[in-house]
Curated annotation (Swiss-Prot):
Residues at which FAD binds: 154-163, 187-189, 299, 310, 367-371, 396-398
Key words of the record: FAD, Flavoprotein, Mitochondrion, Oxidoreductase, Transit peptide
Active site residues of this protein: E273 (proton acceptor)
Lineage, highest ranks first: Eukaryota, Viridiplantae, Streptophyta, Embryophyta, Tracheophyta
Annotated GO biological process: 2-methylbut-2-enoyl-CoA(4-) metabolic process; 2-methylbutanoyl-CoA(4-) catabolic process; L-leucine catabolic process
Protein task: Short/branched-chain acyl-CoA dehydrogenase (SBCAD). Uses 2-methylbutanoyl-CoA as substrate. Minor activity with the straight-chain substrates, butanoyl-CoA, valeryl-CoA, hexanoyl-CoA, and octanoyl-CoA but no activity with isovaleryl-CoA.
The protein, known as: 2-methylacyl-CoA dehydrogenase, mitochondrial
Annotated gene: 2MBCD
Organism of origin: Solanum tuberosum
Transit peptide, residues from-to: 1-25
Keyword flag Transmembrane: no
EC number, UniProt record: 1.3.8.5
Amino acid sequence: MHKLFAVRSLSSAIVKSFKSLQNQQAAFSTSLLLDDTQKQFKESVAKFAQENIAPYAEKIDRTNSFPKEINLWKLMGDFNLHGITAPEEYGGLNLGYLYHCIALEEISRASGAVAVSYGVQSNVCINQLVRNGTPDQKQKYLPKLISGDHIGALAMSEPNAGSDVVSMKCRADRVDGGYVLNGNKMWCTNGPVANTLIVYAKTDTTAGSKGITAFIIEKEMPGFSTAQKLDKLGMRGSDTCELVFENCFVPNENVLGQEGKGVYVLMSGLDLERLVLAAGPVGIMQACMDIVIPYVRQREQFGRPIGEFQLIQGKLADMYTALQSSRSYVYAVAKDCDNGKIDPKDCSGTILLAAERATQVALQAIQCLGGNGYINEYPTGRLLRDAKMYEIAAGTSEIRRLVIGRELFKHQ
């Protein structure tokens, strides 16, 4: 009983520390990275996320579901978070990728699961429509997605086509007035709850990468269905499933981009997807620091706080430099993208660095908490499970290394 009380007392101290965000942020200065307006935006999103998302993070993970008592999608829409890169005429903020990274970082700090679903909605779906949609498509789909009334998703991977996306088997056969889709898509984030999905299928099975087309799918389309929700290791509550297409008719006006140009739509968006999602592991690393710093101040061994020991201070230093270097890289590349300089190797580099560092920082957070880090009274285990996803999703760490190496070799 005494040990349980001690655990809960320390856990309570950590919860209280979340309420002093300004003090925490002072220890992680962004003065060299952000201007005053960007800092105010970061503080505003941090306050929103800690008040409206963080209190549900443990329950979301435990139940593998968003809370029923609050509509987080609509709440984020009311706070103008979904359309950060979208034009104002559709309800967006038109602020750019740096602001988008800042928002995703702070949401991830509150809940990794909510952040990855938010990233798919705001970047992978909405931003792809902004970049590639026709005026009619934008007018039809963007306002409801940006407001949070509708949820978006994207599907390219299949049970037997992951990194080798060009080997996809999902087909789109031409018919009068449109196409008929048949096949399956796998690991679709937001799939079970999405109203609007961007889906890639082969319109010409003999043309290789030039035979793939992107389509806008609506959940009500006959022949489209979702399979059972997947039970994941981490990012639990971020609904993920398999998509099934059985003679699903898609009209011509729902082609995104042009027929045969799906790989261009995919790859041009993938660079920006990797950049924005790289802010997710940055937020997870910050969440680790939010837990560890108050813990090592409260936890005593040998008559003094364990944070006074050099071994612990060394761990804190390693965690801090991993966080700040990753954050600086993400912000710098986001600024370049806002200036029209989209570099595949740096977009891949941001998420390669941040994802692998986040896994290591989460492991160190568990180590700093010792036995408490290994029990579910503390969120460190959840943070580790969530962090690992970023080494796999949006292209694995191995694929990111290939992209970087190929770009470096090509330019030489």
